[in-house]
Regions:
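Flexible glycine-/small-residue-enriched beta->alpha junction loops
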Residues: 104-152
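Claisen-condensing/thiolase-fold acyl-transfer catalytic domains that form or cleave C-C bonds
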Residues: 20-21, 28-29, 35, 54-105, ...
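Generic N-terminal amphipathic, Lys/Arg-enriched alpha-helix
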Residues: 3-19
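Glycine-rich, mobile lid/loop segments that gate access to catalytic sites or pores
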Residues: 135-196
Length: 354
């Protein structure tokens, strides 16, 4: 495989509600910051790919407006995925492996505060049997959490401990929405919003945007910083019908992990950090088990999605945060992104600092 590296990243502050700027205005400064971080200009970029959701923006082909943030010139080959921008990164990675391009700029954005995100995401469900019932994402995640509790592996205290660690880690992340020291005992006093989930178990509504620069390593400039080379990447999807899945286990994640291990040659115990896209606290535990992670690997040093969750960019942020961790001393990072209800579709990547 061609050696593809992540070299630049920028993220807007993850705030609860952006009342002044629209999506383009949020995105524009982050593009400049990411290019500066990489030591590049738009003239150095061969391909642009984005991830967003028309249902969140409330308009068809809303991503076209975001192209304005790239500038009128120079013209660029552009593409879009109607899902998390982590899959936009995957599209760019494939193009680089195929020799079509050398460099790419990836971005994702979302203003979840303008709509009802838990209801909007029900459009990902089976259109014949589930979507017409309008089950929201929190209720579905609670269903999954109940299955996990009934398995006897974890309980609500374990869920709260995930949040405690997330908030503690997020204190080092200036862009995090939720950060600070909390205790599991205090968290467990909060009322349920959908048993066994409480508000803190759910990712916060967040407005923002993120931008990432990657390319074939030989074509990238030396910006004086460590780069994050993608040693392996794979994604797997499970069946659409929830009743046919083992909700307490993420089979697709385990399958993707096996492929990434074969590609990268990196054993699970060699990862210093893991950035996991788990929008609900029980899902962190499900992913940890599926990946075989131990306490040797620091999970979500950025705080993860429970500290800030830009819809359609949270998966891309896991890649960006892995770059930041590598630039701060980590050697290897495991990156995870998800799409669909209850961890239906999972993408994994092995990233190594050079």
């Amino acid at each position: 495989m061609r050696e593809v590296a992540i070299i630049g990243y920028a993220q807007s502050p993850q705030i609860r509600q952006e009342t002044v700027c629209n999506e383009v205005e949020i995105l524009m400064p982050e593009i400049d910051k990411a290019l500066t971080d990489a030591g590049m200009t738009m003239s150095d970029i061969d391909f642009v790919c984005s991830g967003s959701c028309d249902y969140i923006a409330g308009g068809a082909f809303s991503f076209v407006g975001a192209v304005d943030s790239l500038g009128a010139t120079p013209c660029k080959m552009e593409s879009h995925v109607e899902m998390d921008a982590a899959w936009a990164l995957y599209e760019a990675w494939i193009k680089i492996q195929a020799g079509e391009i050398k460099t790419a700029l990836i971005y994702g954005f979302g203003k979840s505060s303008v709509g009802q995100l838990p209801d909007v995401m029900s459009q990902q469900l089976d259109p014949y049997y589930l979507a017409p019932l309008w089950p929201d994402t929190i209720s579905l995640a609670a269903l999954q959490a109940n299955v996990l509790v009934q398995s006897g592996r974890y309980n609500e205290t374990d869920f709260a401990n995930v949040v405690v660690e997330s908030r503690r880690n997020a204190k080092a992340n200036n862009n995090a929405q939720l950060a600070g020291d909390v205790s599991a005992a205090d968290l467990l006093k909060a009322p349920y919003i959908s048993s066994p989930l409480r508000k803190h178990d759910c990712c916060p509504i967040t407005d923002g945007a993120s931008v990432l620069i990657l390319g074939e390593k030989s074509a990238l400039p030396d910006n004086g910083k460590r780069a994050a080379v993608i040693r392996g990447m794979d994604h797997r999807m499970e069946v659409h019908q929830l009743g046919l899945r083992e909700l307490a286990n993420s089979i697709s994640t385990a399958q993707a992990m096996a492929q990434v291990k074969d590609q990268s040659g990196i054993a699970v115990e060699q990862y210093d950090i893991a950035e996991l896209y788990a929008p609900f606290s029980p899902q962190t535990l499900i992913l940890k088990d599926a990946l075989g992670l131990t306490d040797k690997t620091h999970i979500n040093p950025s705080g993860g999605p429970l500290a800030g969750h830009i819809m359609m960019s949270a998966g891309l942020d896991r890649f960006g945060m892995s770059l930041r961790a590598i630039q701060n001393g980590a050697d290897r990072a495991l990156v995870h992104a998800t799409s669909g209800p209850c961890l239906q579709h999972n993408l994994l990547a092995a990233v190594e600092g050079v």
